[in-house]
Amino acid sequence: MFRNQYDNDVTVWSPQGRIHQIEYAMEAVKQGSATVGLKSKTHAVLVALKRAQSELAAHRKKILHVDNHIGISIAGLTADARLLCNFMRQECLDSRFVFDRPLPVSRLVSLIGSKTQIPTQRYGRRPYGVGLLIAGYDDMGPHIFQTCPSANYFDCRAMSIGARSQSARTYLERHMSEFMECNLNELVKHGLRALRETLPAEQDLTTKNVSIGIVGKDLEFTIYDDDDVSPFLEGLEERPQRKAQPAQPADEPAEKADEPMEH
């Protein structure tokens, strides 16, 4: 199909009923480094993989503080995420100033959905090329929300977005029944294990490339970076594929090729 006929602007529909500019923005989210969000009955946790633009540059921030009860992790264009984060901070400040109370998480997510929908319907605008995982805690308990460049948003028990995030989602689906009863340390470890699934076999999580955000009952949103991550990583078991295999003694003869394999 000649997509160039229908992807010049966000207001043009293809004959198949698709808007290609929005689909391209969704692809931008998949280019960002992976991030994971999950919740229990008392806490919501964000775990993100940080990248460095080069060996000479510092790692980029992946988890941002919005309010005392809300934080976000991002995948996609950092500049777009910064703009949306500033919008969210302003809405939270307005709620505290006008109503003297924290802004409910679901209300904030609804406002983000309305803001990101505007450039998907107006000529000369482009969709925001960033996906967000929003972690928060309010009177309804802990929350994990996912937002998309298409202006859709979803209430999740656990979610992962970004590059190679399907591997993390597979882990989350396998262990989802355990999350609600987990304590905080176990919940963070589940998030780290899920994030580790997105890495190639030769890489592993370190204090330099991991960032953790936690919010919960009687706990304001807190970001852990660098050395603060060490206590969480120390209790994490080694990846099965990275465990060293015992070396075969040199004097032990190799198995014969014609011997049947054991099952």
From Swiss-Prot:
Protein name per UniProt: Proteasome subunit alpha type-1
GO biological process: one example: ubiquitin-dependent protein catabolic process
GO CC entries: cytoplasm; nucleus; proteasome core complex; proteasome core complex, alpha-subunit complex
Similarity comment text for this entry: Belongs to the peptidase T1A family.
Location in or out of the cell: Cytoplasm; Nucleus
Residues bearing attached sugar chains per UniProt: 110
Basic and acidic residues bias locations: 253-263
Cross-link (Glycyl lysine isopeptide (Lys-Gly) (interchain with G-Cter in ubiquitin)): 115, 208
Function field: Component of the 20S core proteasome complex involved in the proteolytic degradation of most intracellular proteins. This complex plays numerous essential roles within the cell by associating with different regulatory particles. Associated with two 19S regulatory particles, forms the 26S proteasome and thus participates in the ATP-dependent degradation of ubiquitinated proteins.
Modified positions (N-acetylmethionine) in chain numbering: 1
One Pfam family, short name: Proteasome
Coiled-coil region list: none
Phosphoserine modification, residue list: 110, 177
Summary of subunit composition and partner proteins: The 26S proteasome consists of a 20S proteasome core and two 19S regulatory subunits. The 20S proteasome core is a barrel-shaped complex made of 28 subunits that are arranged in four stacked rings. The two outer rings are each formed by seven alpha subunits, and the two inner rings are formed by seven beta subunits. The proteolytic activity is exerted by three beta-subunits PSMB5, PSMB6 and PSMB7. Interacts with NOTCH3. Interacts with ZFAND1.
UniProt keyword annotations, A-Z: Acetylation, Cytoplasm, Glycoprotein, Immunity, Isopeptide bond, Nucleus, Phosphoprotein, Proteasome, Ubl conjugation
InterPro entries named in the record: Ntn_hydrolases_N, Proteasome_alpha, Proteasome_alpha-type, Proteasome_alpha1, Proteasome_asu_N, Proteasome_sua/b
Main location: cytoplasm
Superkingdom of origin: Eukaryota
Keyword Iron set for record: no
Region (Disordered): 232-263
Organism lineage string: Eukaryota, Metazoa, Chordata, Craniata, Vertebrata
Keyword RNA-binding in record: no
